[in-house]
Amino acid sequence: MRRATLHGSDQSLRSIRRMIFALSFITITGGAILAQDATAPSVPVQDGAPAQDGVPVQDANTTREYRNTLRAIVDPQPLLADHPEFFEPIIERGRFEAPPIIDDPSGDLSVRAWRFSYNARGIIEMPNRIRADQTAIIMVHPWAIDDDWGWKSPQPNGVADFCTPEKNKLAARHTKEVIDPFLKRYRDDVAFVMYSLPGPADPIRTKVYRSFGKTPTAQERSAGERELRKRLADFDYRGEPLPDRLTLGPQQPVADYFRQFPGLDAGARFNNEGFWSLPIPVSTSIDVKPNDVVIFDDEGYPPLRDFLKANKVKHVLLTGYATDMCYCRTTAGYENLSKDFNVFLVADASLATFPANSTPRFAVNAAISFASLNQLITQVSWVHPIGESKTRSEAAAGAK
């Protein structure tokens, strides 16, 4: 039926062929398009927009026509190469530069970013200028596991966060060496530094941390910290050992094997009943400040969205864990935030889960690469105040 319909209309077929030819011509003659100045600004719908450093600054309510011009980057350097211990650098042959997507009036923070397009045959980079005071830095799930708070991986075989004490230790070091300095550098400039945590806005943690509706006093914080430490210390972090015998049927012994001994069981069997009901603190690898805000996952996304919008936040620099799971799909994950805000994934300020590997380098590379199909990716060294000289890695990545 489909074939008959198509051949029944020669005119439609000719139209389709002309369209395919036109698209092919655009692709083949892309060099002409690429030859245009990739830094040329988008054309505003309304004339007379004020300019800043020669680039028109758009009014908040003015739509504009974006010139999607791409210019090839000659001899591009690897992306995300600043922390090779944690992130395997991204290498792609096709690299292009495009005009800014965001150019905020009075923008004071430069955020170079990139995305991948199969149709464009490569990575597209663009400079952006945003206002720091309209930006939130959010860290997803900085769990205080196996650190000074006392929330511990249950023994002998319990799992939480990156699922082994050794992997949790590596993640804590990444937090301390990469994420915490980033938070410290911009805390006084951005609208908020925020952390998302599992669970409800319980009576203990709302004494320890600022939340949407409450900023605790110093006395409340001190009392809350004592309560939290006691609650965590009182738990029995012991679960069952691994099974020493399994029952396998004659037909599907492989399925029987994995059903009784899965690769990841974070339930009461190995973690002990009540483990996941404990109030999880923010990792001690972060120097949390009184004005930092905690997002409680159980409240859902709408309260977070409304809080940010009420405080005129437009942009989010997203950090945290784990790139392939909570970072994308929990309350403060990019799948939610990108519906309402301009989100930049700070890729080297994130780690993916890394089963069967001693390093997260390759897992986070894969997770970020996949996310780049529909998200803008940046890195710590690509975020800097306007007027500050480019970092070596940014200059190298953008070299033409």
Residue positions per predicted region:
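N-terminal secretory signal peptides that target proteins for export/translocation
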Residues: 1-16
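Bacterial N-terminal signal peptides
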Residues: 19-31
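Boundary at the C-terminal end of the N-terminal hydrophobic targeting segment
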Residues: 33-37
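Long, intrinsically disordered low-complexity tandem-repeat segments
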Residues: 43-58
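Active-site-adjacent betaalpha module
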Residues: 59-137, 142-161, 165, 180-189, ...
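Short beta-strand segments at enzyme active-site cores
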Residues: 192-197
